[in-house]
UniProtKB/Swiss-Prot annotation:
This is Trigger factor. It catalyses: [protein]-peptidylproline (omega=180) = [protein]-peptidylproline (omega=0). InterPro entries: PPIase_dom_sf, PPIase_FKBP_dom, Trig_fac, Trigger_fac_C, Trigger_fac_C_sf, Trigger_fac_ribosome-bd_bac, Trigger_fac_ribosome-bd_sf, Trigger_fact/SurA_dom_sf. PANTHER family: TRIGGER FACTOR CHAPERONE AND PEPTIDYL-PROLYL CIS/TRANS ISOMERASE, TRIGGER FACTOR-LIKE PROTEIN TIG, CHLOROPLASTIC.
Amino acid sequence: MQVSVETTEGLGRRLTISVPAEQIEKMVKDGITREAKRARLPGFRPGKVPLSEINKRYGQAIRQDVMGEVMQRNFIEAIIAEKLNPAGAPTFMPGKSVGESFEFVATFEIYPEITLTGLDTIAVEQPKAEVNDADLDAMIETLRKQHATFAVVERASAAGDKVKMNFVGSIDGEEFDGGKADDFELEIGSNRMIPGFETGVTGHKAGETFDIEVSFPEDYHAENLKGKAAKFAITLTEVQAAQLPEVNDEFATLFGITSGGVDALKAEIRKNMTRELEQALKANVKEQVINGLLAANDVTIPSALIDGEVEVLRKQAMQRFGGQTKNMPELPAELFTEQAERRVKIGLLLGEVIKTSELKAEDSRVQALIASMASAYEDPAEVVAYYNSNKEMMQNMRNVALEEQAVEALLKSAKVTTKEVAFEEFMNKASGRA
């Protein structure tokens, strides 16, 4: 076998491989002989079919199989000999005879050679937060509101109330499509309506008729309403006030607390809040580290890896539609390209961190990750057992553990400062509510 390597563009490589023709002819002959031994043809005894008959019937197919095997086998031998690391499957060009050799071409991309740089320039502001009594009280108040009942009241509406109304909207004196409703229910403070609408409804009693003037936002979804000033004629028909449940043992049972009452409920809520806070703090630091790593290391990435990641993201997006994708057009790759590129770069760079730091997934860390995740379920022991019995899920958790270890390794050389933050402020920002 003779091999020549060319660089086409960037990470692209072209291998030209020559194989002695006699080697191929021998493989074809051996293939015909094997087929003759197992062939069952009318007019011939089993195993006695002439080789010429086998060649006439199956020779072309056997030769094609041999060519495919020759290309695959010699390609693998060639990349090992040339120390090439392909990213994705190769494309084989049709082979041709050159003198006494069979020559074929394989084109592919290789993984980039990565040398990590600028690790000491990564800047991380590590947030520090804890769950205090005020945070716990605020969470309990939120849970009370979530389990509130509503009762009709004879007073002016206020924030937190539910109101029922009839309204007609108009622009320049003309009604517009979608601007009219009867028995429309709205919770004041939900921010469901355009700016100014809920404020205009606040302070009115059932039975009152009044007008409010508002403007549709410039980014409103309906093109014909963007930025337009509108008037709504409103008749308020009902005001309901929230009735919050008392925090007692009965309230605790709503959350699966069967013993220990309010104290047990508070302990469980604090535990859950602390777990979520720790996860959010860890995710925040990880994002900063990865952003710094990307900024310090520009990596050329193989298009084959991007294409593969695009397909993964596309399938995930389709699955979020609940599998109802039969009649849906395929989502364009452009929707996922930027995210795919980022994910591939992160994978390559973290992979290099793991390799250069000689990291291996620590069993204790893997089990701690599983236990932490399982604690959010009703039967944690069952979840832990399920993970430990599933090879694929265990491998996923090992990958998560390795990522954590890689981030910790990067933190050792990063410029780290700390900042005290309030629980509510930090969690709102982490969830995108700030």
